[in-house]
Regions:
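Short Gly/aromatic-enriched secondary-structure transition segments
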Residues: 155, 220-223
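Glycine-rich beta-strand-to-loop/alpha-helix junction loops that act as flexible
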Residues: 47-49, 70-73
Length: 305
């Protein structure tokens, strides 16, 4: 059996020692870094947080190998969604996999597709009204536009130790009082090119494959990574003071009944804004609006606890 190990920021091969000792298998070969297709690798261990996972998703999907997530980042929302709350949980899952290759599941991933020439003049070789999908970007947890994207941008500039100790929440509070609502049009899969689901002043829109982001904020409490659906949460132009009171409820998923919060499920949505806005996913910048956001079923093989 052969395994590869990928390390995110702040991690190194020394973190692999516990997994080598836990298996006690001398016949297990290791390599550091992303394996090549067909090189005999049986599984990949990924040490890091949501951002590290996000940056490798494209290659992981292509390889199609089982991936073990080892929570070693600042937020670890995706690891928690899979059931890994500590490195010890990952070690136990690795021991089971080495014994009988069990507890492997294929889960959904979110997909962001930037729209080229949406709403603008077509390129010379395109018919009027034609929409071009640029390169697709995978995400594992949640994509966001608006207030949460701005908070992610600011949080990424914080020292790593602070980001892992409430930095997202600390950045959020002042941003609430200076962020202006923006017009946004969201169309679901059945209404793309037709009916508008939302065209009101908006503070944020989150598109969730799993339930949490920002280190535990349960923005989409009903989200599941194996149902083929995005959970979409849209927060309208709420008074900043009311919004400041609202955000603590998100940690418990109790915000869905509050007036101004819209929540629905769809396999695919189109998002358009009057001016291009940043799109962040898993805490990382992806592109700018307009975009289509959807789900790719059973895109990633992962080890589960």
């Amino acid at each position: 059996m052969r395994a590869a190990a990928i390390f995110g920021l702040g991690c190194s091969p020394r973190h692999l020692k516990a997994f080598q000792v836990a298996t006690g298998c001398r016949e297990l070969g290791w390599r550091i870094g992303m394996p090549a297709a067909g090189d005999g690798t049986d599984a990949i261990l990924l040490f890091g947080g949501d951002g590290t996972i996000h940056r490798h998703l494209g290659q992981l999907v292509k390889l199609g190998l089982p991936v073990l997530i080892v929570p070693a980042g600042s937020g670890n929302d995706f690891a928690r969604a899979l059931g890994f709350r500590s490195v010890r949980d990952s070690i136990a899952a690795w021991q089971r996999f080495c014994a009988d290759q069990s507890h492997v599941a294929a889960i959904d991933l979110g997909v962001i597709s930037p729209l080229a020439n949406a709403g603008g003049a077509p390129a010379p070789h395109e018919p009027a009204g034609h929409t071009v999908l640029a390169a697709q970007h995978y995400f594992c947890s949640v994509a966001g536009i608006g207030l949460d994207a701005e908070v992610s941008r600011l949080a990424n500039a914080l020292p790593r130790w602070l980001l892992g100790h409430g930095g997202y929440a600390l950045t959020l509070v002042p941003t609430i009082f200076r962020f202006a609502p923006f017009p946004m049009k969201i169309s679901s899969a059945d209404e793309i090119g037709g009916s508008t689901l939302n065209n009101q002043p908006t503070l944020l829109a989150a598109f969730a494959n799993t339930s949490t982001y920002g280190g535990g904020m349960k923005i989409a409490p009903q989200a599941k990574f194996d149902d083929g659906q995005l959970d979409v949460c849209v927060i309208g132009a709420i008074n900043p003071f009311k919004l400041a009171c609202l955000f603590p409820t998100i940690y418990f998923g109790r915000h869905l009944t509050i007036r101004g919060v819209n929540y629905f499920k769809s396999p695919r949505v189109r998002v358009e804004t009057e001016t291009p806005l940043d799109v962040y996913a898993d805490g990382e910048f992806v592109c700018r609006t307009p975009v289509e956001v959807g789900v790719q079923r059973a895109a990633l093989k992962v080890l589960l606890p």
